[in-house]
């Protein structure tokens, strides 16, 4: 990670999690220490973040505990990075307070683990709720333009219009 960031001439300026499942917080301590960044999450993710040590033990995964949040992100807030404005969309269901980052001007959304190519986020982990996830997708993501590119937390990108038509979990 460090070498790629250096090779690309980048400088991390924020540490933001879409949600706090263990696979998304494993690097928080490293990133926070390396670039002196505070963690930003939705307040509703605190219980999930605080369960990180227990969950890592269940999976046998080494874990340097994440720092506590330095600030909280709320639905409708805007994040500006290098001139790109991203609006916070509240999309619970995969976790209690998942958020997505929508860039209207450039036509993309960072979807975390809410919506995937022909799939959706799992809801069998603590704080997950299938009906809530479906509602979030339909009311927060499926109202975006069809050509909006979705960059999920895992797997290939997709488009809102494609998922409306072909996602078997939503049709």
Residue spans for each PLM region:
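Active-site HxH/HxHxD metal-binding segment of metal-dependent hydrolases
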Residues: 2-80, 165-169
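Metallo-beta-lactamase
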Residues: 54-58, 78, 84-171
């Amino acid at each position: 990670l460090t070498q790629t960031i250096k090779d690309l001439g980048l400088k991390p300026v924020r540490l933001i999690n879409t949600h706090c499942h263990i696979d998304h917080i494993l690097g928080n301590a490293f990133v926070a220490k390396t670039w002196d960044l505070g963690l930003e999450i939705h307040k509703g993710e605190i219980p999930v973040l605080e369960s990180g040590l227990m969950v890592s033990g269940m999976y046998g995964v080494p874990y340097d505990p994440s720092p506590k949040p330095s600030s909280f992100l709320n639905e409708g807030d805007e994040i500006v990075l290098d001139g790109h404005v991203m609006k916070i969309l509240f999309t619970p269901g995969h976790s209690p307070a998942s958020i997505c980052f929508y860039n209207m001007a450039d036509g993309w959304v960072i979807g975390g683990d809410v919506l995937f190519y022909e799939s959706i986020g799992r809801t069998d982990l603590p704080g997950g709720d299938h009906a809530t996830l479906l509602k979030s997708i339909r009311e927060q993501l499926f109202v975006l333009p069809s050509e909006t590119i979705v960059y999920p937390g895992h797997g290939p990108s997709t488009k809102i219009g494609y998922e409306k038509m072909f996602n078997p979990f939503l049709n």
